[in-house]
C-alpha cells in the first residue's frame, strides 16, 4: 500500500493526476513460507491501494530467488506511476523552493513513529519496528485536495514526505533550489527525532506566496485535511528553531557526492 500511495503522492506533487501503475516485484525464494507470505501480502496491499486511488495495474513483472545462502533481500515492490497534467504550462510543479519569504506548510496528519525508518537504519544500524500506518481514505483526500490547490495556482512548490522523513523532505527542497528556510517544528508533537525523521504517511510539504497563504489554508481546511505552518523560505541555510542550522552549500555537496562516495 505504501509503495503505491507514495508513487501517487509523487505524481500529485508534480501537478498530475495519478492514472495507472506498473510494477516490478522483487523477493527471495517463494518456496520459503515466510517469503511467499510477504509476496502474497504485498499483492493484497497493492490491490487495496490501487482500488482506492483508482489506478489500475497495466502490467509488471515478478523477480524471485533474490537471495544468497545467508538470507533473502527485503521484500521490494517497485511501482511506476503514470500521471496526466491537464495543462503543463500552468500546472506543472516541482519540489524546489521558489521565492524568498514564501510560506512553508505541512499538510497531513502525522502519526509519529520511527519503525522501519531510514533514520533507524543509517544512524542506529537497526531494521526494526512496525511500518508506518497508512489510512487510504486520508491518503486519497490529501492527494485530491493538494492537486486542486496546485491546479488553482495557490502553490509554488510541493514535495511528499517519504524516506528520511520531514527533515529530509525540507532539505531536498532547499538543495534543489539553493534557497534556505527558517523552520519551527515545535508546532508538531513528539520528540525532535520523531518529528524530523518519522516517515508518517500522507504528508506533503507545500509552499505558497504570502498573499496566497490565507486562501491556501482555507482551501485545505475546507477539503478536510490538516495543515500547519512550519516556516518560511529565506537565506542560504536551513535554520531549525531551537536546534541549529546547516548551510545549503554543505548539504548540496553531500547530496551530489553521495553516490561517488559509496562507489569509491
Please annotate each region the language model reported.
Residues 76, 116-133:
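Gly-rich Lys/Arg/Thr-decorated short loops/hinges at beta-loop-alpha junctions or inter-strand turns
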Residues 18-115, 229-232:
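Glycine-rich anion-binding loops of enzyme active sites
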Residues 42, 49, 53-58, 62-78, ...:
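Glycine-/charge-enriched secondary-structure boundary and capping motifs
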Residues 28-37, 125-135:
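Glycine-rich tight-turn/loop motif centered on a GG-T
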Residues 1-6:
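Glycine-rich anion/phosphate-binding loops
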Amino acid at each position: 500500500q505504501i509503495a503505491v500511495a507514495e508513487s501517487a503522492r509523487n505524481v500529485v506533487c508534480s501537478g498530475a493526476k495519478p492514472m495507472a501503475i506498473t510494477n516490478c516485484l522483487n523477493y527471495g525464494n517463494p518456496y520459503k513460507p515466510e517469503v511467499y507470505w510477504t509476496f502474497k501480502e504485498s499483492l493484497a496491499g497493492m490491490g487495496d491501494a490501487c482500488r482506492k486511488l483508482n489506478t489500475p495495474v497495466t502490467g509488471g513483472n515478478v523477480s524471485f530467488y533474490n537471495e544468497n545462502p545467508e538470507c533473502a533481500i527485503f521484500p521490494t515492490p517497485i511501482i511506476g506511476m503514470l500521471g496526466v497534467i491537464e495543462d503543463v504550462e500552468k500546472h506543472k510543479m516541482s519540489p524546489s523552493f521558489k521565492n524568498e519569504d514564501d510560506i512553508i506548510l505541512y499538510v497531513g496528519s502525522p502519526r509519529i513513529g520511527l519503525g522501519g525508518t531510514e533514520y533507524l537504519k543509517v544512524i542506529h544500524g537497526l531494521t526494526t519496528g512496525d511500518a508506518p500506518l497508512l489510512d487510504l481514505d486520508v491518503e486519497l483526500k490529501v492527494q485530491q485536495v493538494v492537486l486542486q490547490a496546485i491546479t488553482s495556482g495557490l502553490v509554488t512548490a510541493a514535495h511528499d514526505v517519504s524516506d528520511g522523513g520531514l527533515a529530509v523532505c525540507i532539505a531536498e527542497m532547499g538543495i534543489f533550489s539553493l534557497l534556505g528556510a527558517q523552520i519551527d517544528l515545535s508546532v508538531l508533537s513528539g520528540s525532535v527525532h520523531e518529528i524530523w525523521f518519522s516517515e508518517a504517511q500522507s504528508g506533503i510539504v507545500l509552499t505558497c506566496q504570502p498573499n496566497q497563504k490565507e486562501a491556501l489554508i482555507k482551501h485545505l481546511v475546507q477539503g478536510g485535511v490538516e495543515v500547519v505552518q512550519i516556516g518560511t523560505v529565506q537565506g542560504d541555510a536551513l535554520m531549525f528553531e531551537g536546534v541549529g542550522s546547516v548551510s545549503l552549500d554543505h548539504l548540496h555537496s553531500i547530496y551530489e557526492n553521495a553516490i561517488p562516495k559509496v562507489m569509491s
